[in-house]
Amino acid sequence: MAILDHVINIDPFWDDEYLYLDYQEEAFNNPLDTERWLKMGYRCNFVGAMCDMRKLQPSWNYKFVNHFTDLGWKDVGTSYYRMATGTILPTHQDIYKKYVELFDLQGKEHTIRRAIVFLEDWQSGHYLELKGQPVTGWKKGFTPIWAYDAPHMAANIGARPRYTLQITGHV
């Protein structure tokens, strides 16, 4: 596994409740990226299924919110993500449009942080790339953290869904 800027390992305390959430597929929120990917030759599914804070979250979700609040993050939001087999999210930078509007962070985007908690051990075909560094072989609880503009990509060419928890906050 590559050496990343900032990684924490969260001791697993969660059960499989995340498997049964009301996941919904939503269009990728940056049509310019989607257009660029199509021009590059990508012809795959660019979205996974999300269950964000507008929907019922697992009973233990508050523990993640508290953990990141204790790290100094403000306005912590969570979104569970199920990436099905064949889903590819090519290299992109998150734009946080709704988050910036909701918490009045226009001009302060540099304070936004993102963490991805891997809810299960790595499976063959599951992939993350962060700032050009490939990441595989993770254990449940592995949590890379990055600044708002870090380029990253994800894919699932494996046989099982890839489950993660996306955490957003600002410092």
Each model region followed by its residue ranges:
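Non-heme Fe(II)/2-oxoglutarate
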Residues: 1-80, 88
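Structured loops at beta-to-helix junctions and adjacent beta-edge loops in soluble globular domains
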Residues: 42-43, 49, 83, 120, ...
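A general structural signal for short secondary-structure junctions and capping/turn motifs
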Residues: 68-72, 106-109, 136, 155-157
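Short, conserved beta-strand element in jelly-roll/cupin
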Residues: 82-84, 102-124
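Histidine-centered catalytic micro-motifs
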Residues: 88-97, 104-108
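Catalytic core of Fe(II)/2-oxoglutarate
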Residues: 121-171
